[in-house]
Regions:
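Hydrophobic alpha-helical core bundles mediating ligand binding, dimerization, or RNAP-core interactions
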Residues: 116, 120-123, 143-150, 180, ...
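Short, Lys/Arg-enriched, Trp-marked, Pro/Gly-tolerant hinge/linker segments that flank
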Residues: 108, 130-138, 150-187
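Amphipathic alpha-helix face/heptad-repeat signature
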Residues: 112, 119, 135, 139-142
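Short loop/turn positions at the edges of beta-strands in beta-sheet-rich folds
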Residues: 31-33, 58, 68-70
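Generic protein-terminus/edge-of-domain signal
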Residues: 1-49
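Conserved metal-binding segment of the jelly-roll/cupin
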Residues: 48-61, 77
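Short beta-strand His + acidic residue motifs that chelate non-heme Fe in jelly-roll/DSBH
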Residues: 39-40, 62-68
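A hydrophobic/aromatic-rich effector-binding and dimerization subdomain
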Residues: 1, 65-129, 154-157
Length: 188
C-alpha cells in the first residue's frame, strides 16, 4: 500500500536495494515477525529477531541489510509531513525521539505484542477492503493511534531511564532542532 502519507510492504527489497546504503527521508518502522534481520543503522550494526521492532528516524542511513531465509517482516514508512502533523500536538514527543535515536530496537513482550498485532490487523484489514473516499482518512487515524502507542511506550522507557540516573547529554544540533520544532509549533 502506498499514498502520500504512508507506505506499507512485507518485502525488504521494496525499501532496501541489494548491497546499497539508503538514506531514508521517512520515519520507518521495521517489524520482524519471524526469522532474523541484520542491518546497519548509521554504521552501527543492529540485529532483529522475532517480535522486534526497529524504529528509524528520517535522514538515517541504512545499509548491509541481510535476512534469514525464513524471515517475515512488515515495513511501515510514514512521510515527514505525516510525522510533523502528529508531533505538533504532542509535547512529549521530543523525549521519545531522543530515546528512539539511542535505542532504535524494541522487543515486544507478550502483552505489548498483542496490542501491536491489533493495530497491524486493523491497518491490513482496512487496506484490503475496497477503496472508498474514507479509506485514506481512516488509515491515517489508525496510523496516528499506532504512532501514539509507540511514543507512549518509548516515553515510559525514557522516563524510567531518567529515574535510574541515566541521562543522555544534549547535543547542540539536537538543541537547535528542538528550538526550531517548538517555534514551528508555536507558529500555528
Amino acid at each position: 500500500y502506498i499514498d502520500d502519507y504512508m507506505f506499507l510492504t512485507e518485502r525488504l527489497e521494496n525499501v532496501f536495494p541489494e548491497n546499497r546504503n539508503v538514506k531514508l527521508e521517512v520515519f520507518l518502522m521495521l517489524y520482524c515477525e519471524e526469522g532474523e534481520v541484520k542491518l546497519e543503522l548509521n554504521n552501527v550494526a543492529r540485529h532483529l529477531q522475532a517480535n522486534d521492532l526497529l524504529i528509524s528516524l528520517p535522514n538515517t542511513i541504512i545499509g548491509q541489510v541481510m535476512a534469514s531465509p525464513n524471515h517475515k517482516v512488515k515495513v511501515f514508512c510514514f512521510s515527514n509531513r505525516f510525522i510533523q502533523r502528529l508531533t505538533q500536538t504532542q509535547k512529549y514527543s521530543w523525549k521519545s525521539i531522543c530515546y528512539i535515536q539511542e535505542n532504535p530496537i524494541k522487543h515486544f513482550g507478550e502483552n505489548r505484542n498483542e496490542t501491536f498485532h491489533q493495530y497491524l490487523k486493523l491497518i491490513e484489514g482496512k487496506i484490503q477492503t475496497s477503496p472508498d473516499k474514507y479509506q485514506k482518512e481512516i488509515l491515517l487515524h489508525i496510523a496516528s493511534a499506532f504512532y501514539g502507542e509507540m511514543v507512549a511506550e518509548t516515553t515510559r522507557k525514557s522516563i524510567e531511564k531518567e529515574k535510574q540516573g541515566y541521562h543522555t547529554p544534549v547535543k547542540q544540533p539536537d538543541f537547535i532542532f528542538k528550538q526550531f520544532m517548538e517555534a514551528l509549533t508555536a507558529d500555528n
